[in-house]
């Protein structure tokens, strides 16, 4: 895998399905070829008050890594990532007396998947409890493993079919420092699958907070 950038796309005077259809036409016009579909989902569990300070565990799955389960423990002061196999899902059901699932906040992004040269493009319709929340575009540049080395190329590519919605500056996620005592940021670090998961969690959290009604996708 390479470096992945996530970009929300505004739904203006269109349904979710119309927005996806519009973007599909743009992507196909580039010469991209559809290669199946994708799915990224997230379910959140919260610890019961009786065991002390509240902790949250986010469980995510990505169809690009079907054998892996990604979990992120949020202690309130820091986030601890963990990558395991599918048995972790079973473990979460076994500890349900301690961690309870917020079923109403289960969220996912799914849609068509395209290949265009060295780029992988995914057009995601984001839904939470079957309610449409927005459109999230994922672009991966597969030959590169360090975001700072290919951001300008990815920015130009993203702006080519998403327009001015794409900022000229690299997403804030990549500006995070790896070590508090250095200026080494995630943009200069080797990209890992957990970085894609962290970006999805960041956007999913924003969508969960969203209260403005969004036009539902047409079937």
Swiss-Prot record:
Where is it mostly found?
nucleus
Which Gene Ontology MF annotations are present? transcription coactivator activity
Q: Where in the cell is it found?
A: Nucleus
Q: Which GO terms describe its cellular component?
A: mediator complex
Q: Which Pfam families match?
A: Med20
One of the GO BP terms on file: regulation of transcription by RNA polymerase II
> Which InterPro entries does this UniProt record tie to the protein?
Mediator_Med20
Q: Does the keyword Transcription regulation apply?
A: yes
Indicate yes or no for the key word Nucleus: yes
Which key words tag this protein in UniProt? Activator, Nucleus, Transcription, Transcription regulation
How does this chain assemble? Component of the Mediator complex.
Q: What's this chain's function?
A: Component of the Mediator complex, a coactivator involved in the regulated transcription of nearly all RNA polymerase II-dependent genes. Mediator functions as a bridge to convey information from gene-specific regulatory proteins to the basal RNA polymerase II transcription machinery. Mediator is recruited to promoters by direct interactions with regulatory proteins and serves as a scaffold for the assembly of a functional preinitiation complex with RNA polymerase II and the general transcription factors.
Recorded family membership: Belongs to the Mediator complex subunit 20 family.
| Name of the molecule in the record | Mediator of RNA polymerase II transcription subunit 20
What is the species of this protein?
Aedes aegypti
The upper taxonomy is: Eukaryota, Metazoa, Ecdysozoa, Arthropoda, Hexapoda
